[in-house]
UniProtKB/Swiss-Prot annotation:
Entry protein name: 23S rRNA (cytidine-2'-O)-methyltransferase TlyA
UniProt EC number: 2.1.1.226
Signal peptide: none
InterPro entries hit by this protein: RNA_MeTrfase_FtsJ_dom (IPR002877), S4_RNA-bd_sf (IPR036986), SAM-dependent_MTases_sf (IPR029063), TlyA (IPR047048)
Top-level taxon of the source organism: Bacteria
Length: 253
């Protein structure tokens, strides 16, 4: 059974709506996103080899958990960071964190779930942080605040950054001044390559060479600051328009 058919039946929605949810990576099967053509029946058969599942019906079995991203997280960004942390075994517990570009709070939500000691949330916008996060005493919110003018008497054990419509290279100096050790940056090529690079109608970049050059320039800029690159990998979730994005995990020396 195809994943799109499974989603339409399980959620009692049209096939087109199911496809829309899947293409936007807004529906998860057992915590992960899959393509519309993914074989759910085969997936279930493999689960049965290691788990005692009941009942047998593919649409009723408790072995297949279907979740809508909007019902779990305040934004898609949350799942991006969650997957990256889990895949790299990065420990957040008891760390004083700074989140740059907090927006609705996707990264903030995951830092909280991972028991961060305190989170300073920074954003140039206003009234964006989700209501469920605004009242949390661990969060110190700075709205209408540009990183380049932000002042802090303390430095942060972990800095996360997810920004749009600006190149990360323009922020590295300011991040370096605030960082004690760990830095996790979401690199978005669509905001790094310049305006004249080929894109499709949705805004998805179509120039691999330009993307590679932008990444190399970014990595060189980080290296000049003395940062040690621990890992870089594609985000498990693409940008809203479908652009591939990349996580970078650095240690400040």
């Amino acid at each position: 059974m195809r994943f799109d058919f499974f989603v339409s039946k399980r959620l009692n929605i049209s096939r087109n709506k199911a496809l829309e949810l899947i293409e936007n990576e807004e529906v998860l099967l057992n915590g992960k996103s899959f393509k519309a053509s993914f074989d759910v029946k085969n997936f279930l058969e493999n689960l049965k080899k290691t788990q005692d599942l009941n009942p047998e019906d593919i649409l009723l079995t408790d072995g297949l958990k279907l979740d809508l991203l909007s019902e779990i997280y305040v934004s898609r960004a949350a799942l991006k960071l969650k997957n990256f942390l889990e895949e790299n075994g990065i420990e957040i517990k008891h760390k004083n964190c700074l989140d740059i570009g907090s927006s609705t709070g996707g990264f903030v939500q995951i830092l909280l779930e991972n028991q961060a000691l305190k989170i300073t949330a920074l954003d140039v916008g206003n009234n964006q942080l989700h209501l469920s996060l605004r009242t949390n005493e661990k969060i110190i919110l700075h709205e209408n605040t540009d990183l380049r003018t932000f002042k802090s008497e303390e430095k942060f054990e972990l800095i996360t950054c997810d920004v749009s419509f600006i190149s990360l290279i323009n922020l590295l100096y300011y991040i370096d001044n605030l960082a004690l050790k760990e830095i996790i940056l979401l690199f978005k090529p669509q905001f790094e390559v310049g305006k004249n690079i080929k894109r499709d109608k949705k805004g998805v970049l179509k120039d691999d060479k330009a993307i590679l050059k932008a990444r190399m320039d970014f990595e060189k800029a980080c290296a000049k600051l003395g940062w040690l690159l621990k890992n870089t990998q594609k985000s498990s979730i693409k940008g809203k328009e479908g652009n591939v994005e990349y996580f970078y995990y650095y240690i400040k020396n």
